[in-house]
Amino acid sequence: MIQISDYHADSVPGLIEEIEHESPDIIVSTGDLVHDTGSYTPGVRLCKHLIDIAPVYAVTGNHDLWRSDYEDFERELTAIGVKTLHDERVILKRNESEISLSGIDDPFALNSVKIAENIENSLAKLPRYNGYDILLFHRANLFDRLKYRGFNLILAGHMHGGQFRIPKGRGVVAPKSSWGSKSSMFFPKYFAGHYHAPHTDMIVNRGIGNPMLLPRLFNRPEITVITLKHKKEI
């Protein structure tokens, strides 16, 4: 599986070739395929290439939903075969095994109470599932609200790797749209990489583009390559 997040770019040389080289079974996007301003054509163009490599599943990010023409953008994604998960899950089967891939919409609001309400409303729409369950969700900073909700793995983005990275250390700056969720502007708790809680793991993708006026420093763009193994193979 390949995870991408926070594309925020017109084009990225070598990106498609790198993803194709990994031969993923599926590709997932954890939000912000496009910026909230400008054309959404780069996001469509990217997905046209991705869908030729593997099935593509996506969830919304804040920049996606801030666009007045987001519905037009999603219609174009649907037309080329991208499945956007709006508070729903799909069952993926391979040989005799299956997993659930769930996705909920970005819960953007201006205060933490409304954000929590939006998350609860989204989770309530997901049908019950007793097997291995992966959640696609944009905002890594909200992991504490999700880590005890029964998901085995949460894939997230939004934090842009902390924008600046202290060498061998933490990310420094959180996106402005994280602040209403009681997340600190500086040195956010979750910014990139692998985090573990009892029964749940979260992988935070650093993102590809840069929507902020600040440059990325010690914080290279990334795609995340994830290999799931059956218990019998471990």
Model feature map: region roles:
Residues 1-8, 98-108, 134-138, 201-207:
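Active-site-proximal beta-strand elements of phosphoester/diester hydrolases
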Residues 1-2, 90-103, 130, 196-202, ...:
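Beta-strand-turn-beta hairpins that frame and shape the catalytic cleft
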Residues 1-13, 33-41, 64-71, 109-114, ...:
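Acidic/histidine-rich helix-loop elements
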Residues 2-88:
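Membrane-embedded segments
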Residues 8, 34, 63-64, 89-90, ...:
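Catalytic metal-binding/acid-base residues of hydrolase active sites
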Residues 25-27, 54, 131-134, 152:
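Conserved acidic residues
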Residues 75, 79-82, 94-136, 143-144, ...:
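Binuclear metal-dependent hydrolase catalytic cores centered on His/Asp/Glu-rich metal-binding motifs
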Residues 139-224, 232-233:
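Conserved beta-sheet core of the metallophosphoesterase superfamily
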